[in-house]
From Swiss-Prot:
Annotated binding of alpha-D-mannopyranose, by residue: 36, 118, 129
Domain Gnk2-homologous: 28-133
Function: Exerts antifungal activity through its carbohydrate-binding specificity.
GO molecular function: D-mannose binding
Listed name of the protein: Antifungal protein ginkbilobin-like protein 2
PROSITE patterns the record matches: GNK2
Amino acid sequence: MSMGSFGFALAVMVLAVLVASAAGAPNTNLVSSACNGNKIPSGNPFFNNLGALLVDLEKNTAFSGFDYKASRAGSGGAPTAYGRGVCKQSISQSDCTACLTNLGGRIWGISKNAIGARVQLTDCFIRYEQYSI
């Protein structure tokens, strides 16, 4: 292989690695959060409604124009959970879903079980409340 061919092949490989890394996982760095000061009492059935809502946001936001609102009716006397999932338009559907799934798994710790929260990662956002949003 000549030096010119080797240089070209090396350049193509470097470019391929850069493109692959740029198209990789979403940016899930925490940007901001704001949480209601009231907490969900331990064992409250609202946890179940909210958990189902978060899964709904994770699964459907990417396929609803990257901006999706939903609610989960209260059960066991618990209030209805309302929420919104949003992703940057510049990321792929799979990255949107991955970002929201990442956030859904972290939101309990970030919000410290608040009855309402807004949490922004670099590539996605979730808001949930006990009232319509």
